[in-house]
Design a protein with these regions (language model features):
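Short small-residue beta-strand/loop micro-motif enriched in glycine and branched aliphatics
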Residues: 10-13, 106-107, 135
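Short aromatic-glycine motifs in intrinsically disordered, low-complexity regions
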Residues: 104-112
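Generic recognition of long tandem-repeat/solenoid scaffolds
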Residues: 4, 94, 108, 135-137
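Glycine-rich, flexible loop/turn motifs
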Residues: 42, 90, 94, 106, ...
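A short beta-strand motif that forms part of the nucleic acid-binding face
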Residues: 8, 16, 59-60, 70-74, ...
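RNA pseudouridine synthases
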Residues: 1-93, 99-102, 177
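Pseudouridine synthases involved in rRNA/tRNA modification
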Residues: 112-118, 123-125, 129-136, 142, ...
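Histidine- and/or cysteine-centered catalytic micro-motif in compact active-site loops
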Residues: 59-60, 84-86, 99, 103, ...
Length: 202
């Protein structure tokens, strides 16, 4: 496995807009530089403007086993987010299905026609900057839908600071304030529980 702390602003996969500067391109360059001929296999994915832990499998077996753990909800993912406003409920669970928004290939929304999505959260800290109330929130995903944390936080009235798709532009940060700081899973070969932490330095 290759474990990377992805900076914000870098997509995991190549696209028309980021054909040569994706994280996968960087991993290929690294593999080539050490003479490792491997297919690029990201296990988990993060949005371009989300920072944090991304894991790449070095062979098909590891990729398959880790993907199976994720599908069985045995691959625990935890995040830190800074959200708009102060939460009335300091901890809770958001259970609201998510679907693709009509007429959009990118945006998602809460919809009764969507797939099950469950997000657990607890507020770590509340603070104000220049009259703007914000909350630092610890988030644990039970499911892994596209944009799940961003959609759910906006749904309860606390969009992530800097999230221009589901909230508003921020004067304090030029990206969404969301960081994947911890993953926990059982190694498919050793059977040992791995707990990987990556602090948010911003």
């Amino acid at each position: 496995m290759l474990i990377i702390n992805k900076p914000a602003g870098i997509p995991v996969h190549p696209s028309m807009q980021h054909f040569e500067d994706s994280l996968s391109n960087g991993v290929k360059y690294y593999f080539d530089s050490i003479g490792l001929k491997r297919k690029i296999r990201p296990v988990n994915r993060l949005d371009r403007n989300t920072s944090g832990i991304v894991i790449f499998a070095k062979n098909a077996y590891i990729h398959d086993r880790l993907s199976s753990l994720m599908q069985a909800n045995l691959f625990k993912k935890e995040y830190i987010a800074v959200c708009e406003g102060f939460f009335e409920e300091k901890e809770g669970t958001i259970s609201a299905p998510i679907a693709r928004k009509k007429n959009s290939i990118i945006e998602r929304c809460v919809s009764p026609l969507g797939s099950s999505a469950i997000t657990h959260y607890n507020v770590l800290k509340e603070f104000s900057v220049d009259g703007h109330d914000m909350s630092e929130v610890h988030v644990v995903l039970e499911t892994g839908r596209t944009h799940q944390i961003r959609v759910h936080m906006a749904y309860i009235g606390h969009p992530i600071v800097g999230d221009t798709l589901y909230g508003t532009k921020s004067d304090f940060i030029d990206r969404q304030a969301l960081h994947a700081y911890k993953v926990e899973f059982v190694h498919p070969i050793s059977g040992k529980l791995l707990c990987i932490n990556c602090n948010w330095s911003e």
